[in-house]
Design a protein with these regions (language model features):
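C-terminal motif of bacterial Sec signal peptides marking the signal peptidase cleavage site
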Residues: 17-20
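Acidic/polar surface patches and capping/hinge elements
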Residues: 22-438
């Protein structure tokens, strides 16, 4: 882990070294690098603070929207995204005829939002100060201060929406422990944690008209009949898990992205911190921006729209998870098939149907394909610094499909759950394309 953190520090240091070069030009490569470094810094904080996947999506979306709404003015005529979303007041506008550095403004907007949503604020200070100090060296005092004030105003306007999105009201709710009845979710081994974010469907969506707009069909009815659809799907998970190929194991590990994993060694327990599923796809958005050599406005738009897809997809998925509250494979298999069976991956603490990975990855893939192209090949290095793995994909859709099936390989989802999750996620992505992108 130390070596990985060192690698990340070197990357950020190199990016910071480029900030001072031609900062007035928003389409300068250094401007894109600043945005990428900002997102990467946020990912590291989210990992350190161990935010849940739904909460992480909320942090990413407000920060990324703030960044975009500030930097979009570098390209005259670029339209607002928040104007097309639910719950936002009009964004502040720059003064006509005044000089701004919009990359600096975007950075200030980004971290104005972030600082109100994470715990480890102190860890941001060194990074932010390094960025701001380099801009101070490049800009006259008036332009610097004007840019910072504009970015701060945008960030605060974005936060105004965050204060009324349902998040605060959802805190302090009683624990969700499931139901002690056949077919219903119960806390799972090894740590039997209570259900995570069971009120997430009360969050105010950005594009969806309601949390249930993309509601999937009801899951197969629970049954102990060996000929039933439910039992056959549970047995399939068991059979696959007992006969995993090395490639299937690699795929399962690669897409695990489970921030809840707790390792056990004798009487000792310790958390194995990982990137979240949403963080993985924000990393893919960064790879696409860098590989495509887009300007900073397009890069910021990619981050913003990807985060919108993740945020709404989590709301849609969690709405169904706690409505149907389907039992996890490990519970069923241990009770009905093999009491000693252990899934290849540790089961995350929330109901089974539908698969969160399948839903959010399908939504993100739809949006990224709309921005960068359907047959966009890329080497995914998002997890390289964290688990030492990378994979090549021919399209965003291919990556999403692999992420989806990985949950069956991992022994934590039934096939129907990943299939229906992908369908719902694609619907979320298509709605974003219809209402925001086109």
């Amino acid at each position: 882990m130390v070596s990985n953190l060192c690698k990340k520090g070197i990357v950020v240091a190199l990016l910071l070294a480029t900030v001072g070069c031609n900062t007035r030009a928003a389409n300068d490569v250094s401007s894109v690098d600043v945005l990428l470094a900002n997102e990467d810094q946020l990912t590291q904080v989210i990992i350190y603070d161990v935010f849940t996947p739904p909460v992480s999506s909320r942090i990413y979306v407000y920060a990324s929207l703030a960044s975009y709404e500030a930097i979009r003015h570098a390209n005259p005529g670029t339209t607002s995204i928040t104007d097309k979303l639910h719950g936002f007041a009009p964004m502040p506008q720059p003064e006509a005829g005044k000089q701004y550095d919009y990359t600096l403004a975007a950075t200030k907007a980004f971290f104005t939002s972030v600082r109100k949503m994470v715990f480890s604020v102190d860890s941001l200070n060194k990074y932010e100060n390094s960025v701001y100090n380099r801009y101070k060296q490049q800009l006259d005092k008036e332009t610097y201060e004007r840019s910072v004030l504009f970015g701060e105003a945008v960030g605060k306007q974005v936060l105004a929406r965050a204060m009324n999105d349902g998040y605060i009201k959802s805190r302090g709710k009683p624990k969700y422990l499931g139901a002690n009845e056949p077919g219903k979710w119960q806390p799972t081994p090894p740590d039997y944690l209570d259900g995570v974010e069971w009120c997430w469907n009360t969050m105010l969506p950005l594009v969806l008209d309601s949390a249930s707009q993309c509601k999937p069909p009801a899951p197969p009815t629970y049954s102990t009949d060996t000929a039933s659809i439910f039992f056959r799907e549970a047995r399939e998970v068991y059979t696959i898990g007992k006969n995993l190929t090395e490639e299937q194991k690699t795929i399962a590990i690669y897409w695990d992205d489970n921030p809840f994993v707790i390792e056990h060694s004798g009487h000792m327990m310790f958390g194995n911190k990982k990137i979240t599923p949403g963080g993985h796809w924000m990393g893919i958005a960064a790879i696409a921006a860098k590989q495509s050599k887009v300007d900073a406005v397009v890069a910021a738009r990619g981050f913003a729209l990807t985060s919108v897809a993740l945020y709404d997809a989590f709301i849609a998925c969690w709405d169904e998870k706690y409505r149907s509250s389907v039992v996890r494979p490990v519970t069923v298999i241990n009770e009905l098939i093999d009491k000693n069976w252990i899934p290849f991956l540790q089961t995350p603490p929330f109901p089974e149907y539908t698969s969160g990975h399948s839903t959010i990855t399908a939504a993100a893939a739809e949006v990224l394909a709309a921005i960068y192209g359907k047959n966009y090949a890329f080497l995914d290095t998002s997890d390289l610094a964290y688990i030492g793995m990378q994979r090549q994909f021919n399209s965003f859709e291919e990556a999403a499909a692999e992420a989806s099936i990985s949950r069956v390989y991992g022994g934590i989802h039934y096939r129907n759950s990943v299939d229906q999750g992908a369908v719902a996620g694609k619907k979320v992505g298509q709605l974003i394309m219809e209402r925001v992108i086109k």
